[in-house]
A protein has these predicted regions:
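Anion-binding (especially nucleotide phosphate/pyrophosphate-binding) glycine-rich loop
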Residues: 1-29, 36
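N-terminal glycine-rich flavin-associated loop
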Residues: 1-13, 40-59
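Generic non-transmembrane alpha-helix signal with a bias for helix starts/N-cap capping motifs
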Residues: 1-4, 133, 178-179
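Generic beta-strand structural signal
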Residues: 14-18, 28, 43-48, 63-65, ...
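Short secondary-structure transition/capping segments
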Residues: 28-31, 160-162
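Short beta-turn/strand-loop junction motif enriched in small, turn-promoting residues
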Residues: 35-37, 72
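Short Gly/Pro-enriched turn/cap motifs at secondary-structure boundaries
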Residues: 38-39, 117
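Phosphate/pyrophosphate- and phosphate-bearing ligand-binding catalytic cores of soluble enzymes
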Residues: 51-176, 183-184, 188-201
């Protein structure tokens, strides 16, 4: 997503700025409908190329997809799921004459760096924000879990909805940390957190 965002800004394509600082691949951004308060992937996707579990490839229009909070639901007819995102086509609008895309991008990136952990070993926000007054990060913080670790998998002390690999954390470490965090939040706040990341196996 970082490369796509930079390419769009370099060529004056407006509407991609919300991707600034969002980690991961373009396929992951489409599959998870990545976004922020400024926009999300489903708003700019025009077509998606997929391959199902039997190897059959198919193209689907972005308007046929039901885009939800951190999710995309394909139309009926995709019997052999899950599908892999092979590619996507995006729509854009030209930047306005007075608009400075580079400045907008830089300000967004600087803002994220002040409020979120940065660098390798990150998967973005780990849990979906539940309905209600408090975000997932606020609930985890209220549970006193900033800095809590399982092996090298750690709840970021900067932003509690980021789980960070401090060096040699395994997938098992992250899964156990995810379970422990969700369990404590559920016991303390009565809220069941749902992972934003996709656990494949």
């Amino acid at each position: 997503t970082a490369s796509l965002c930079r390419y769009a800004i370099k060529h004056g394509f407006n509407g991609f700025q919300f991707l600034a600082g969002i980690p991961g691949s373009v396929g992951g951004a489409v599959s998870g409908n990545s976004g922020t308060a400024l926009g999300h992937a489903g708003e700019i996707v025009r077509e998606v190329w997929t391959m199902d579990s039997l190897g059959a490839e198919r193209k689907v229009s972005g308007s046929q997809i039901s885009w939800g909070y951190r999710s995309m639901n394909l139309p009926q007819g995709f019997a052999h799921k899950p599908v892999i995102i092979l590619g996507a086509a995006f729509g854009f609008s030209p930047a306005q004459e007075e608009q400075n895309l580079e400045r907008e991008y830089r300000l967004l990136l600087e803002g994220r760096k002040k409020t979120q952990p940065w660098g390798p070993g990150l998967a973005g926000c780990f849990f979906k924000n539940p309905p209600g007054l408090f975000s997932a990060g606020a609930l985890i913080d209220r549970a006193g879990l900033k800095g809590f670790s399982v092996g090298d998998a750690t709840v970021s002390p900067v932003h509690a909805n980021f789980l960070v690999n401090r060096g040699k954390a395994s997938a098992a470490d992250f899964l156990l940390l995810m379970e422990k965090v969700a369990d404590k939040v559920r016991r303390q706040s009565g809220v069941s957190l749902e992972p934003e990341v996709k656990v494949l196996s």
